[in-house]
């Protein structure tokens, strides 16, 4: 699991928030030789230090040797000790175990209940609801990291907030959780209607002027291919 964490972090090293203020008192307790030889690549050291501080706060107790092994293999493009699909599974399990149960507004709860009651709807992980608009003929995407799709996105009131002008490629780790859940279950060639709870989309914050807080989203997605 620790190698999995490193592999994900190496692929997606984006800090969305500033780190908390450092505790300077600890610097005076460090052995003097640590300051004697400055790192040859200060940027690399800075990235490693920031990564270490973040992990110490968010995931204390990681085995450092396994952490560095996963980071090294992912960064160098070497074969990983754990298959990509297992990495995704482990990280999702950790996220679910450490994330508070999201609060659903009454309006969203009513909308999702009505959607769930529609004929042909089935529920996936995280409460994502899918229904088949066109049957697919191909295989599932398996451990693919990119998908080729056409889509249209709507709010609960039917207002279109986004749609593709033409088919587009997306990296799976760049889309919302609800999209990943649905796409992992879709066969190539299928067209699905996907209803995503706000907790699997943009949550309490929303997304700018387009998507309000606590908004469930509806997508019509055509899965054309993967790689």
From Swiss-Prot:
InterPro entries the record matches = PPIase_dom_sf (IPR046357), PPIase_FKBP_dom (IPR001179), PPIase_FKBP_N (IPR000774), PPIase_FKBP_N_sf (IPR036944)
Q: Which Pfam families match?
A: FKBP_C, FKBP_N
Q: Name one GO molecular function term.
A: peptidyl-prolyl cis-trans isomerase activity
From the record, give the cysteines joined by S-S bonds: none
Natural source organism = Pseudomonas aeruginosa (strain ATCC 15692 / DSM 22644 / CIP 104116 / JCM 14847 / LMG 12228 / 1C / PRS 101 / PAO1)
- GO terms, biological process: protein folding
Name of the molecule in the record: Probable FKBP-type 25 kDa peptidyl-prolyl cis-trans isomerase
Q: Which UniProt keywords apply?
A: Isomerase, Rotamase
What's the EC number here? 5.2.1.8
Q: Which SUPFAM superfamilies match?
A: FKBP-like
The record ties this protein, via PROSITE patterns, to:
FKBP_PPIASE
**Purpose:** PPIases accelerate the folding of proteins.
| Family of the protein in this entry | Belongs to the FKBP-type PPIase family.
Q: Encoded by which gene?
A: fkl
Cite the PPIase FKBP-type domain residue spans from the record: 144-227
Q: What class of enzyme is it?
A: isomerase
Q: Which reaction does it catalyse?
A: [protein]-peptidylproline (omega=180) = [protein]-peptidylproline (omega=0)
